[in-house]
């Protein structure tokens, strides 16, 4: 089951990135379809958050249980692999999803500029916190199961 959740979580990243880029373009071009696109982005990002939180608190490999396994939070912070999964990934992604949620509120009221900048910041945060294949030590494949 855990492998399936990791694959779903990984595949959903592409959906979110595509929707985020489309929403960003719509916000900068003041396209009124942003209200609908931003809703799909909001839904998919919250599903991703729930999947991620489930993995964080239930996985023995990465996440919350790693603190205990490594003998405390101080040891987690010394290990770059553990620090990424226990602190950096979840913190940055939660902030990005908060920004996506706030931008959705702006998009509903057709406040394009505010939504656009929140989407830009969310996109930068997501790109920084994804375990891309070229990131040494924390790499995950481009597509799940590869």
Residue ranges and their predicted role:
Residues 1-146:
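Membrane-embedded alpha-helical bundles that constitute the cytochrome b-like, heme-associated redox core
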């Amino acid at each position: 089951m855990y492998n399936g959740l990791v694959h779903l979580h990984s595949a959903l990243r592409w959906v979110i990135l595509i929707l985020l880029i489309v929403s960003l373009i719509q916000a900068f071009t003041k396209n009124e379809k942003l209200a609908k696109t931003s809703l799909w982005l909001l839904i998919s990002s919250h599903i991703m958050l729930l999947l991620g939180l489930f993995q964080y608190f239930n996985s023995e490999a990465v996440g919350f249980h790693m603190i205990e396994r490594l003998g405390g939070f101080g040891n987690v912070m010394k290990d770059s692999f553990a620090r990424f999964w226990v602190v950096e990934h979840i913190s940055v992604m939660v902030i990005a999803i908060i920004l996506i949620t706030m931008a959705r509120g702006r998009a509903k009221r057709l406040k394009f500029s505010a939504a656009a900048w929140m989407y830009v910041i969310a996109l930068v945060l997501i790109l920084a916190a994804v375990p891309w294949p070229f990131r040494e030590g924390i790499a995950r494949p481009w597509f799940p199961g590869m």
